[in-house]
Amino acid sequence: MTAPWRRLRSLVWEYWAGFLVCAFWIPDSRGMPHVIRIGGIFEYADGPNAQVMNAEEHAFRFSANIINRNRTLLPNTTLTYDIQRIHFHDSFEATKKACDQLALGVVAIFGPSQGSCTNAVQSICNALEVPHIQLRWKHHPLDNKDTFYVNLYPDYASLSHAILDLVQSLKWRSATVVYDDSTGLIRLQELIMAPSRYNIRLKIRQLPIDSDDSRPLLKEMKRGREFRIIFDCSHTMAAQILKQAMAMGMMTEYYHFIFTTLDLYALDLEPYRYSGVNLTGFRILNVDNAHVSAIVEKWSMERLQAAPRAESGLLDGVMMTDAALLYDAVHIVSVCYQRASQMTVNSLQCHRHKPWRFGGRFMNFIKEAQWEGLTGRIVFNKTSGLRTDFDLDIISLKEDGLEKVGVWSPADGLNITEVAKGRGPNVTDSLTNRSLIVTTLLEEPFVMFRKSDRTLYGNDRFEGYCIDLLKELAHILGFSYEIRLVEDGKYGAQDDKGQWNGMVKELIDHKADLAVAPLTITHVREKAIDFSKPFMTLGVSILYRKPNGTNPSVFSFLNPLSPDIWMYVLLAYLGVSCVLFVIARFSPYEWYDAHPCNPGSEVVENNFTLLNSFWFGMGSLMQQGSELMPKALSTRIIGGIWWFFTLIIISSYTANLAAFLTVERMESPIDSADDLAKQTKIEYGAVKDGATMTFFKKSKISTFEKMWAFMSSKPSALVKNNEEGIQRTLTADYALLMESTTIEYITQRNCNLTQIGGLIDSKGYGIGTPMGSPYRDKITIAILQLQEEDKLHIMKEKWWRGSGCPEEENKEASALGIQKIGGIFIVLAAGLVLSVLVAVGEFIYKLRKTAEREQRSFCSTVADEIRFSLTCQRRLKHKPQPPMMVKTDAVINMHTFNDRRLPGKDSMSCSTSLAPVFP
């Protein structure tokens, strides 16, 4: 039984082998190539065009035909396909069609693209382990256990990151995100979470549900001044939005639209090329590749030969992103099947739940595949099956159409490239031949009506610094302009409700393109409009009328010396007189014999009593004599130093007195903003709704807060314009707070006005533009060019230079202070110290001689002399007792007794002489 059994088993094996070859392989003996089958499930909508082949179905056939014609890719294999059509959102029909294709033995199923249908087909493919190829964005949960699929559409997290990088590159501080359905919030989650990490404010809006009319939403965004908008919608909806935005007047250079659809390049953008709108999008189709361009051209030729399509806003014959992704998907599956060896395909039944035994192996081949297709580099994540590595072109609308301006990739991020040479720039990249509306107001010398004998029209009506500046900018940038005066005549301020007025409001409402005027750049205005770099720097100061000359005081003779110096001179006078009195009493050489001819006189005299000492000091200070002459060296030192001191003081006083008598002092009641804040007699204010008023209103400095409280409490303190404020300053006791440049211009032409104090703050005048205006940077560069060429200074000299007022000398002679003549007090003090030391020496020396002569102890002699010297009322005392004297016939010359010589006498002689007699 063994042999028959073996023979039977061999026959059965040969039978099944032959059956498999006949079923799945084309016999080589007949010369037929190997055949593989793929399945495609595509949706169609109800209506008259329901049976018309859509782009995806055509791409499915197109790619299969390309592969079959190109034998280098599948040399021994023929690719066949099965196409099934289903209704949108019909997941049951999608399940049935998928089972039918699996029964035919397909190696992979492509589509469908709609969410619920995709999930149904994916579940079947995962159960039977057949690769499912997805081509549309689809949210894949983190806990998704389906592994038998790949998605060629870029990963939504990467796309969201690309949008965020683009927004950051554009330096947007605010934007509006408009999404079509709830899946848009998932696709844009990276951008929506940006405010928590980046300095950007987002406003989220949703397009109308079940309606293509977006005009109410566009009107609301236009009213809200939302100029930077990100649209997450299909290309069909994008075409409708652009058409409706054009009708709403929103296709201007102030708007910037970003569309997340990868089919923006396929839209017919011809009507918007010269509108100035900033239109940015993404493209994954690699049109720069020559091979891709050839395939796209073949596709276009076939599509143009097809039946004409209804108006859809698309370019004729253009290859959409879905078609390109499907083309790449078919090629990847074909290449992977060619690389797989000894892999057979059998019919699969959905109700039997028996998977394809080669499905896992084939799925791994697909996930590990790397391919350069129409959409660039294709690499899948081996775990999730998502396409996370790809390149996105950043495209922008220019005059010549859409142009590639950058590239984004998950690895390298965003790289903005320069505009290629020879390609047309965006209409807003150049101001050449553009006509701009310029808003301004009358303000001398910036903008004034031109004086002329004939009637002037248009821009010729105006002249001034800003007009010359505008002409220079127009010459550099090549634009033309129309000047319009602002309706309310105001610069622009924000009320309590947040509403703006003046030129700022006209820029916000896009009634003007530029505001060329002395418009101050402030933090509050920067939130509403954009500014160029300042063309003039300045600050707030005080305009006040010049003070009249004041009558001198009856005590103005005291002004040459400061009060401190007068006090110090008085103290020095008192001190020197007292020291002179004390030293004169202590010094023995200051005592003299009042009667030198009377040898019996026992009394010596001292002229420097307390009153005489004061009289001596007063006579020296007044440059008059006192007939009191010091005799001792110590008292002469005091006298000499005091005379030197009085010489310097009197000379300085005389010199400074001349300045005070010849120069009339001009005194102003205020010298600074602090002086204004501390008083209420002089009323002060600023131009209403101007930058100066806003500065005081927003300031947190206590002085300025106090000033604003004063101005706001008195409505009359604020003036309508500068002319009213100047007239009020001239006629009333009023100070006008205004820009220093205007004060400089006014004081050059009105000599009765002057600037009080320095600058309170520092700021600049800039040219205002609407928020997000493409002209701002161009204007800034032109201003910097004018500054480098010194033309801004030349223009200012032209308009600020007037007849001028005679320059005033410094009319305030400063009183001499201790810093200037303090040294003379030091010399005086040193002289006093020296005289005291000399007096002490004289005192000790003389008393020692007296003690020896009278044969007394030195200490007792000193005590007696000190006791007498401290008796201030007495000017006479007994002279020291000399030795016993005898008469002689000799005549004694009194030149040897200098200490007894009377003042004014050179010598004395007596008829008798005395000689010492010793016992």
UniProtKB/Swiss-Prot annotation:
Q: Which GO terms describe its molecular function?
A: adenylate cyclase inhibiting G protein-coupled glutamate receptor activity; glutamate receptor activity; glutamate-gated calcium ion channel activity; glutamate-gated receptor activity; kainate selective glutamate receptor activity; ligand-gated monoatomic ion channel activity involved in regulation of presynaptic membrane potential; transmitter-gated monoatomic ion channel activity involved in regulation of postsynaptic membrane potential
Q: Where is the signal peptide?
A: 1-31
Provide GO CC annotations from the record: axon; cochlear hair cell ribbon synapse; dendrite; dendrite cytoplasm; glutamatergic synapse; kainate selective glutamate receptor complex; perikaryon; plasma membrane
Q: Where Phosphoserine occurs, residue numbers?
A: 869
Please give the residue ranges for the topological domain Extracellular.
32-563, 658-820
Residues reported in the UniProt entry to bind L-glutamate: 518, 520, 525, 691-692, 739
Subcellular location field: Cell membrane; Postsynaptic cell membrane
Q: Which GO terms describe its biological process?
A: chemical synaptic transmission; G protein-coupled glutamate receptor signaling pathway; glutamate receptor signaling pathway; modulation of chemical synaptic transmission; negative regulation of synaptic transmission, glutamatergic; regulation of membrane potential; synaptic transmission, glutamatergic
Q: Where are the transmembrane segments?
A: 564-584, 637-657, 821-841
InterPro entries with a match to the protein in the record: ANF_lig-bd_rcpt (IPR001828), Glu/Gly-bd (IPR019594), Iono_Glu_rcpt_met (IPR001508), Ionotropic_Glu_rcpt (IPR015683), Iontro_rcpt_C (IPR001320), Peripla_BP_I (IPR028082)
Cytoplasmic-side segments: 585-636, 842-919
Superkingdom classification of source:
Eukaryota
Q: Which reaction does it catalyse?
A: Ca(2+)(in) = Ca(2+)(out)
Q: What does the UniProt PTM comment say about this protein?
A: Mass spectrometry data suggest the protein is N-glycosylated at five distinct sites.
Tissue note:
Expressed in the olfactory bulb (at protein level). Expressed in the deep cortical layers, dentate gyrus, reticular thalamic nucleus, mammillary bodies, pons, and cerebellum of the adult.
Which Cys-Cys disulphide bridges does the record give?
A: 99-350
Which sites does the entry annotate for glycosylation?
A: 70, 76, 278, 381, 415, 426, 433, 548, 551, 752
Q: Where is this cross-link: Glycyl lysine isopeptide (Lys-Gly) (interchain with G-Cter in SUMO1)?
A: 887
Membrane topology per the entry is: Multi-pass membrane protein
Swiss-Prot/TrEMBL keywords? Cell membrane, Disulfide bond, Glycoprotein, Ion channel, Ion transport, Isopeptide bond, Ligand-gated ion channel, Membrane, Phosphoprotein, Postsynaptic cell membrane, Receptor, Signal, Synapse, Transmembrane, Transmembrane helix, Transport, Ubl conjugation
Name the family: Belongs to the glutamate-gated ion channel (TC 1.A.10.1) family. GRIK3 subfamily.
State any further remark. Answer: The postsynaptic actions of Glu are mediated by a variety of receptors that are named according to their selective agonists. This receptor binds domoate > kainate >> L-glutamate = quisqualate >> AMPA = NMDA.
PANTHER family listed in its UniProt record: IONOTROPIC GLUTAMATE RECEPTOR
UniProt function note: Ionotropic glutamate receptor that functions as a cation-permeable ligand-gated ion channel, gated by L-glutamate and the glutamatergic agonist kainic acid. Binding of the excitatory neurotransmitter L-glutamate induces a conformation change, leading to the opening of the cation channel, and thereby converts the chemical signal to an electrical impulse. The receptor then desensitizes rapidly and enters a transient inactive state, characterized by the presence of bound agonist.
Assembly and interaction partners: Homotetramer, and heterotetramer with GRIK4 or GRIK5. Can form functional heteromeric receptors with GRIK2. Interacts with PRKCABP. Interacts with NETO2.
Q: What name has this protein been given in UniProt?
A: Glutamate receptor ionotropic, kainate 3
